[in-house]
């Protein structure tokens, strides 16, 4: 079979059982992949030069269709309460059927790195059925120099075949769609879905499994670094402002989504960004807007004018989860090394729709571990389907529960130790509501959030007075230059103090109920960091 492109000839497609293929294109760049995608009709080019594709019925990840092989090695190491298992025999049958399905196909192969730090990166080979998927993953991971490809030996292999259909009875899965990960054999199989994000997040899941054994904490976070080399980490679930707040013109962006924290500092796992682009505008997010409107960007499910091919980022008729993938170098102030020193600040973002968390609070290491394991934000009507008028809490362990192969306590203990070792200042920032909950209060002004965050990152908050929040126990500043004092204490912003008390106590109960599953895995200091502990002692 023809194999075209620069590669390690000793580790070709046949090494992975991929035989009788029509052709394999090795490490093609964007121009070649555009040509293949257009020739096959799998994508189109818009008026800005971006490559645009639709993903059909799957416009997001399908976590219920993700499975991990349970064998002698993973039986004790994987967190089975949060991961679905399949047997080695079921995976073997699935792998065999993948290889059979690939016969007579043209595949695209990319040799890439998962991780910017040469000491901890994982050499990753990705075979894709679709050219636009190949461009996507080439954009999202880190690309080796051409001179490195001839000796590239993969440590992780991904086979991505959207046209494959799984057999639930034969393969032990839920539907025809499947993501199967074998940590022992270091293979990922993805079938049935055209949604390219499945590749990105399944590779992230494997990094979350392998890196703790090398004393590296994998994190679902964004990160940036100041002019003085002071790096900062931003945790937060969707809608909390993680991407927006880490994109600070006065600081260099390290990455927007996945990072590792090692003895040497922090590093990006990726070489690109995967931004939500629903209602994207030049005014609100100029850098992401510009990056999404040029050759080399990949747009998923973005609606275009049929004649002019001009994108309409405001149109969510296909999905609210429209996406733009682009190389990190498309962002003017991005770090191309993807590495920085030890962080000085760690920020946990929560869009508290109950309106009872302060706009900023300082956390002890034990409180930081508690809130890291909790991973709190809140959903409201208008941003999620099937929600009523009341906010709904969302707790996702380590701010990334779907991607945790190990018990959350593994990552929590690593975080706590790193915070203590490097004397990191930890902050909880509420980007949600103030003056009342969703429906009666107002969204926290972004100007206030930026001012408080700036004061935290530049060290200004170290010189201001703090008081202990009666409800949640963390330290809250009583005055910050440039910020109205009353907004710092949430109860002062509510007209109805009795309703504030009721709402705060209700949220405390939600935190405590969620944390019951971790109580036996943490020490007394972390348990006592729970919201409401001070009130109980009164």
UniProtKB/Swiss-Prot annotation:
It is an enzyme of class 4 (lyase). Disulfide bonds: none annotated. Substrate binds at residues 61, 195, 201, 323. It is found in: Cytoplasm. Signal peptide: none annotated. ATP binds at residues 201, 220, 236-244, 285, 323, 449. Keywords: ATP-binding, Cytoplasm, Decarboxylase, Gluconeogenesis, Lyase, Manganese, Metal-binding, Nucleotide-binding. Its main location: cytoplasm. Its cofactor is Mn(2+). Pfam families: PEPCK_ATP. It comes from the Bacteria. GO terms for biological process: gluconeogenesis. Binds 1 Mn(2+) ion per subunit. GO terms for molecular function: ATP binding; metal ion binding; phosphoenolpyruvate carboxykinase (ATP) activity. CDD domains: PEPCK_ATP. The keyword Membrane does not apply. GO terms for cellular component: cytosol. SUPFAM superfamilies: PEP carboxykinase N-terminal domain, PEP carboxykinase-like. The keyword Methyltransferase does not apply. Its EC number is 4.1.1.49. It catalyses: oxaloacetate + ATP = phosphoenolpyruvate + ADP + CO2. InterPro entries: PEP_carboxykinase_ATP (IPR001272), PEP_carboxykinase_C (IPR013035), PEP_carboxykinase_N (IPR008210), PEPCK_ATP_CS (IPR015994). Belongs to the phosphoenolpyruvate carboxykinase (ATP) family. Involved in the gluconeogenesis. Catalyzes the conversion of oxaloacetate (OAA) to phosphoenolpyruvate (PEP) through direct phosphoryl transfer between the nucleoside triphosphate and OAA. PANTHER family: PHOSPHOENOLPYRUVATE CARBOXYKINASE (ATP), PHOSPHOENOLPYRUVATE CARBOXYKINASE ATP. This is Phosphoenolpyruvate carboxykinase (ATP). It comes from Nitrobacter winogradskyi (strain ATCC 25391 / DSM 10237 / CIP 104748 / NCIMB 11846 / Nb-255). The gene is pckA.
